[in-house]
């Protein structure tokens, strides 16, 4: 937890130093002050400070290092993000990324991930995908194995959001292989869940159940109710593909019980829709109508 009093003291010390500085030292102080402003969620102040630093570096011309310039531009990006000006923020990061790429700086990968995550928050999954793919390519050559696997998993997640199911399987399997080398059990279960869901969407019920059960096994051992719920859901989709409707319904009802008090409205909605589908397929239209009525009450509030 951030100690606000300490942060205010740091701000005061930085402001006291400012009149006695110039050039790069002054720009660095502005960047530090911008960071403190972001901690306080003061996006407008942070933006003004980061832009001051950027102007100093521009005035220095060739004397300013590309890394320092990239740092100032990144500060502008974070400030714009704090102001919910996400399009401008991602464009700012593009400038920083170009500078970091030219110098092959280690911060390049983190900045690529940041930009990709911002695109993901906005639902621009194609742009997010491009960032994570580049980060994965860099990490594959000279990066950390764990981060390489995480980038691969992020690529799989983007493909999941784009509905490119074969690619989900390909990249989740690649991530799983690296996670397995690192004995990262929790992360493997998320790979298995995504693989299972992709198989269900591709109408391969057997594989959906196979991979869903793997995720469920780990979740049960870890007493991870979120994963138990989601893996039960994807296995139910697999049983539905195989027209084993009672098995599907049993799993959906179990998932429904687990998610009921969570406030995870998207997952609650998905489960209800699958139950309605099962009721229709088994000609239980009264139950389907009742479930649809309940769901409409929820969706008018949360959507």
Cite the ranges covered by each PLM segment.
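C-terminal non-catalytic interaction modules
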Residues: 1-13, 250, 254-303
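Flexible inter-repeat linkers and adjacent short helices
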Residues: 1-74, 80-85, 97, 291-303
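Amphipathic alpha-helical segments of tetratricopeptide repeats
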Residues: 15-16, 51-61, 94-104, 133-144, ...
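Conserved alpha-helical positions within TPR/SEL1-like repeat arrays
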Residues: 28-39, 67-82, 106-121, 146-161, ...
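A generic tandem-repeat structural signature
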Residues: 51-149
């Amino acid at each position: 937890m951030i100690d606000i009093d300490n942060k205010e003291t740091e701000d005061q010390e930085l402001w006291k130093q400012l009149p006695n500085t110039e050039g790069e030292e002054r720009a660095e102080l502005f960047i530090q002050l911008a960071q403190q402003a972001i901690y306080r969620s003061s996006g407008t102040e942070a933006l003004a400070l980061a832009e001051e630093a950027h102007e100093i570096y521009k005035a220095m011309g060739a004397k300013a290092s590309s890394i320092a310039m990239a740092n100032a531009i990144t500060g502008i990006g974070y400030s714009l993000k704090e102001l919910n000006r996400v399009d401008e923020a991602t464009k700012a990061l593009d400038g920083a990324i170009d500078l970091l790429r030219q110098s092959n700086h280690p911060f390049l990968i983190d900045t690529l991930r940041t930009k990709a995550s911002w695109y993901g928050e906005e639902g621009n999954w194609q742009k997010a995908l491009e960032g994570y793919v580049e980060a994965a390519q860099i990490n594959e050559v000279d990066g950390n194995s764990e981060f390489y696997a995480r980038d691969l998993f992020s690529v799989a997640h983007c493909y999941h959001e784009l509905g490119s199911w074969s690619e989900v399987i390909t990249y989740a399997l690649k991530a799983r292989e690296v996670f397995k080398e690192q004995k990262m059990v929790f992360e493997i279960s998320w790979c298995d869940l995504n693989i299972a869901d992709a198989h269900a969407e591709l109408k391969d019920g057997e594989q959906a159940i196979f991979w869903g059960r793997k995720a469920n096994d780990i979740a049960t051992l870890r007493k991870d109710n979120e994963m138990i719920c989601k893996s039960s859901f994807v296995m139910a989709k697999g049983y539905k593909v195989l027209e084993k409707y009672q098995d599907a319904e049993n799993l959906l009802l179990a998932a429904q019980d687990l998610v009921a008090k969570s406030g995870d409205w998207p997952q609650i909605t998905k489960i209800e829709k699958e139950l309605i589908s099962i009721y229709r397929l088994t000609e239980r239209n009264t139950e389907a109508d009742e479930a649809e009525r309940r769901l409409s009450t929820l969706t008018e509030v949360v959507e």
